[in-house]
């Protein structure tokens, strides 16, 4: 990184670096560049999902007659949880359509870019399966998760199961509707600005926000400034939350 690089970047915006600050900007850019170079040299970290233990069955975009509450499902499939059981044995789960499941296309609530298909599972998916939960599919989210309503997804509108024709909230719109409507026991979402809290409230569900640091591997961010997400689960009944 050269000392004049900062000014060259700013020229296109009609801005300038104060000469007194030039050395500081050079130090900052050089440090960021060196960090990026070091990271780029690291081997890629790509966890391999256990497809023999947890095979994916019948991955598909649901036909209209398979949908619930408008367009609550992004993709349907079936993954059987741990055969040895676990604390979530017998529970059914849906995942917000920003949580990677190997082999399942992600739509992210948009049609601006083509869907992409992950080749690994998000950490939360592995933990659910190991705990015995059965995963039934991915649920519709709002367009790039930028809405707390339930009508911005390119895949279609999600209706509130308790009040058809009204918003289910967002951006975890499909998941909240599936839980409130009794289709699944639990849904997993992500929240930076109300994306779990709003739909849980509008659909009358319990919310169980995480209090610990979670690994966010294979959960897309909307921008580089989002260094964290607030994962959480949504339940129908208080007794279920307490494990009864």
Go through each PLM region and give its residues.
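Fold-level recognition of mixed alpha/beta catalytic cores in primary-metabolism enzymes, strongest
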Residues: 31-34, 38, 51, 155, ...
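Gly/Ser-rich catalytic/binding loops embedded in alpha/beta enzyme cores
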Residues: 17-188, 192
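A diffuse structural propensity rather than consistent per-protein peaks
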Residues: 1-2, 193
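The catalytic Nudix box helix
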Residues: 13
